Amino acid sequence: MTDRTQPHTVQVHTTAGRFGDTAAGTNRYPDRGPSTSKVIAVITGLPIGGTLLLFAGLALAGTLLGLAVTTPLFILFSPVIVPAIIVVGLSVAGFLTSGACGLTGLSSFSWVMNYIRQTHGSVPEQLEMAKHRMADVAGYVGQKTKDVGQKTKEVGQEIQTKAQDSKRT
């Protein structure tokens, strides 16, 4: 303990700054330019991306043109089309709801069956366990019946002795 009388200090000397700069201010990595794989990616990506963007614009323009042409027809035939759309929409919603409820019921049934199988074992084991439980319950009921019969006999004897005592007095 006595050999540490003077405080110790730590000095940190940085040789590299942030982002790869050295202490002298020059970059550690010389400017080599983009790699060939990056150049190939840009060369192939730009035409493909441009083509897809062109197709998206054409699809939007076609949709707007079709909507502009068919809107007057929808307005003219709306007394027929609107109820038909409502009927078709409700039918589709009904089928989807029916399928969702059926799938939910099936998955719930599957979960319950897996839970029963994992928790309680196989069917023969369940039957054996049920037999043992029934035997235990039958033994318990038999013992209780004997106890109640004995208690009834004792109460009857007490009443008989009290009745005989009351006749004597």
From Swiss-Prot:
Q: Which family does it belong to?
A: Belongs to the oleosin family.
This chain's function reads: May have a structural role to stabilize the lipid body during desiccation of the seed by preventing coalescence of the oil. Probably interacts with both lipid and phospholipid moieties of lipid bodies. May also provide recognition signals for specific lipase anchorage in lipolysis during seedling growth.
Q: How does it sit in the membrane?
A: Multi-pass membrane protein
Which lineage ranks, top first, belong to the organism behind this chain? Eukaryota, Viridiplantae, Streptophyta, Embryophyta, Tracheophyta
Short name of one Pfam family for this protein?
Answer: Oleosin
- Locations listed in the record: Lipid droplet; Membrane
Superkingdom in the source lineage: Eukaryota
- Chief subcellular location: other
Q: Where are the transmembrane segments?
A: 39-59, 73-93
Species: Arachis hypogaea (Peanut)
**GO biological process annotations for this chain's record?**
lipid storage; response to freezing; seed oilbody biogenesis
Q: What is this protein called?
A: Oleosin Ara h 10.0101
One Gene Ontology cellular component annotation held by this UniProt entry = monolayer-surrounded lipid storage body
Segments carrying the region annotation (Disordered) are 146-169
Key words of the record: Allergen, Lipid droplet, Membrane, Transmembrane, Transmembrane helix
